[in-house]
Structure formats: C-alpha cells, structure tokens
A protein has these predicted regions:
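Conserved functional hotspot residues or short segments at active or partner-binding sites
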Residues: 93-197
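Short amphipathic alpha-helical coiled-coil/interface segments
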Residues: 198-202
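Intrinsically disordered, low-complexity boundary segments flanking structured domains
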Residues: 17-24, 76-79, 102-106, 122-126
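Short gly/pro-enriched beta-turn/loop segments at secondary-structure junctions
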Residues: 26, 82-87, 131-133
C-alpha cells in the first residue's frame, strides 16, 4: 500500500527517507538537510520538550500514535476502532463482540507492553454510531516493549478465532499485509510465526 518497499515502522527521519529515495530511485535532487540539535533516535516525542500537535483529528496522544500502526491496520473491517470516542485506536469493539471473552483471549497471548481490558462504548460518529459496542481497551504498560503491528495481527487472529466470519477478515488484507497473511490466520498459524516471516523479508 505504501509508496516504497520499506517496513511500516522504519524509524527513519524525513531527511533520512529523502536521502534514501534520492539515492535508491536516482532522483538526483540537490538536497540540503539541516541537522537538529539535541535529537536522539531513541527518544520518545514527549522527551523532546516539543509541544504535541495532533497529526490527525483522531490521533490525540502518543499512545494512540503508538497503537495506530496495528489497530489502524484492522480498521477497514466491520468493527469500530474507537473513532467517535475520546480514545480512538486505544479501543476496538462491535455489537457482535464479547468484550470479556476477547480481553481474556488477548491477555493469554502475553502481548508485549500491553494489557487488555473489556469495555462498552457507543461511538458518536463513524462506524456503529449510536450503537452499543462490546469490546476491549488497550493499556500501554511498557511503551518500549509494544510491537504495534504484531498487536494488530494478534487482534485480527483472535477475532477470527473467536467469531469466525462475523469478523470481516478479507477487509483488512490491504493493510494487514497480504492474502498469504489472511490464509495463515484462517489456518490457525500462530501470529508470532506469521510476524517472523515478515521480519525475514525485511533483510
């Protein structure tokens, strides 16, 4: 889906991406990069001292930005990712989900840096507006340990395991990876094994 064959979470600055594309694609632009003072690659945004500016109306804090690559990947399906609530991308739900059941299932997966709790909510906009949704809320317990894309994969696999075709798995193919990923979810392959296959392709 992206404009270049790079990992979703590439950890490169805009200047590094510009240099990469300029070289790899033979663009030949006369780039001038102004280096930032005091910048450290390992620093989180809230450690920079800069004021947070919402990159999107539905991404209002750092936890939402951290969870977005995984939770946003399953947004195209028939569930709410919390748009129309105060905490988009920190929760998911649908009228057909059993929140306590899904929370138990996800917590048994021992997801790095995340704990999952059941909740109910009614979105004021977007999917399921005004409907009561059962679902789960993601609490970030260790942001350095969170693997957001794997989280999205684990959530998709758990939804398919628990609810089968009630969950529109086909709708997430474009954002979750590939048809092969969906086939492996349907076959019951462990999500960590599927994600390991992605890592092999990054080299």
């Amino acid at each position: 889906m992206g404009g270049a064959p790079i990992p979703l979470l590439h950890a490169m600055t805009v200047a590094e991406l510009a240099r990469l594309f300029n070289t790899e694609r033979g663009i030949g632009a006369d780039l001038e990069v102004v280096a930032m003072r005091g910048w450290r690659r390992e620093a989180w945004f809230d450690q920079t001292g800069l004021r947070w500016v919402d990159p999107s109306p539905n991404m209002r804090n750092l936890h939402q930005a951290l969870l977005y690559p995984g939770i946003g990947a399953i947004e195209g399906s028939n569930l709410s990712v919390g748009r129309g609530t105060d905490t988009p991308f920190e929760q998911i739900g649908a009228p057909w989900i059993d929140g306590p059941e899904l929370a138990r299932e996800l917590n048994t997966r021992r997801l790095p840096g995340v704990r999952v709790y059941p909740l109910r909510f009614s979105p004021t906009s977007s999917r399921f507006v005004g409907e009561l949704c059962d679902g789960v809320f993601f609490i970030v317990t260790d942001r350095d340990a969170v693997r957001p894309v794997r989280l999205g994969l684990e959530v998709a696999a758990a939804l398919y395991r628990l609810y089968g075709d009630q969950f529109d798995l086909d709708a997430v193919a474009r954002l979750l990876g590939s048809r092969d990923t969906l086939a492996r979810i349907r076959a019951g392959d462990p999500p960590w094994e599927i994600a390991a296959g992605w890592a092999e392709g990054e080299a």
